[in-house]
Design a protein with these regions (language model features):
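Amphipathic alpha-helical repeat scaffolds
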Residues: 16-23, 146-152
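Short internal beta-strands
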Residues: 34-41
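Mobile, glycine- and charge-enriched loop segments
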Residues: 1-15
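Amphipathic alpha-helical segments that form the core helices of the histone-fold
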Residues: 210-223, 234-235
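S-adenosyl-L-methionine/SAH cofactor-binding core of RNA-modifying enzymes
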Residues: 48-125, 166
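Conserved small/polar residues in nucleotide/adenosyl-binding loops
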Residues: 242-244
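Internal, active-site/partner-interface "lid" segment
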Residues: 164-199
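Structured adenosyl-cofactor binding patch, chiefly the S-adenosyl-L-methionine
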Residues: 30-31, 129-173
Length: 244
């Protein structure tokens, strides 16, 4: 797969079917994925069923990383995409079709770690989990039955990414280093602490306000330099408050 990212990670959240996990491991081999990550699996991902389905993708099962929290699984990632089967989220400006999202993703000159998150077989990803992503995407299907099988969704997404990577883009590539998920998360903690300190955030309204601010930062495709500037401003304000 010709690509402008050095590490592609497929992340499954609480998968409950070993056959699906095995099929996804096989797909990782088909599409040159670098790593399979699983968050709080609800089945035996190393079962005979999973291994039989994985075929040449067995190494992805054997070396997959398991996390107890989705946030931790994306800390080292520069760009995070999340699959969403719900049609109502298209009201958000960070939502798009799988084809559009992958074309947008590949408009960046260099991405060190790209993650694609897929939700639970029965209910997908929660709203709070979707907010961890820079962008969410939907695979267009019939409105009468929009939900896809997990492994089918993964196969279509990886195919779309592969197809996008082989296109010739006319637009100029965006040349800057994206901030990692951990850098953004750490900056949010500092900003949240400051906003509580100055009285902008209150306990009963803080979650809603900080979620909107996180959305704003994630949709902006923030660079490492921009995050460092933001953290520098927060640090300087904190120093000034000490002397008031």
């Amino acid at each position: 797969m010709g690509k402008n990212f050095s590490n592609l990670k497929v992340i499954l959240v609480e998968p409950s079917g070993p056959l699906n996990v095995g099929s996804v491991a096989r797909l990782c081999s088909n599409f040159e994925v670098d790593e399979l990550r699983i968050v709080s699996p609800k089945c035996d991902i190393f079962s005979l069923e999973a291994r039989k389905m994985s075929l040449k993708g067995k190494k992805f099962l054997e070396h997959c990383k398991i996390f107890d929290d989705l946030q931790k699984s994306i800390f080292d990632c520069d760009l995070v995409l999340a699959s969403c089967g719900r049609i109502d989220v298209n009201k958000n400006s960070f939502f798009g079709s799988s084809e559009d999202i992958f074309d947008w993703t590949l408009s960046f000159n260099k991405i060190n770690n790209l993650a694609i998150i897929f939700g639970r077989e029965d209910r997908g990803l929660t709203n709070s989990e979707l907010l961890l992503a820079n962008k969410t995407f939907n695979i267009p299907t019939s409105q009468n039955n929009p939900s896809l099988n997990l492994s089918h969704a993964v196969s279509i997404a990886l195919y779309e990414l592969n197809k996008s990577s082989k296109r010739n883009f006319d637009q100029e590539l965006k040349v800057f280093n994206l901030a990692s998920s951990k850098q953004i998360h750490d900056s949010f903690l500092e900003i949240e602490e400051l906003l509580f300190k100055v009285g902008y955030l209150l306990k009963h309204t803080s979650n809603a306000k900080i979620s909107k601010f996180k959305n704003f930062i994630l949709k902006a495709n923030t660079s490492m330099h921009e995050i460092n500037v933001l953290r520098g401003i927060v640090h300087q304000i904190n120093l000034s408050l000490i002397h008031i």
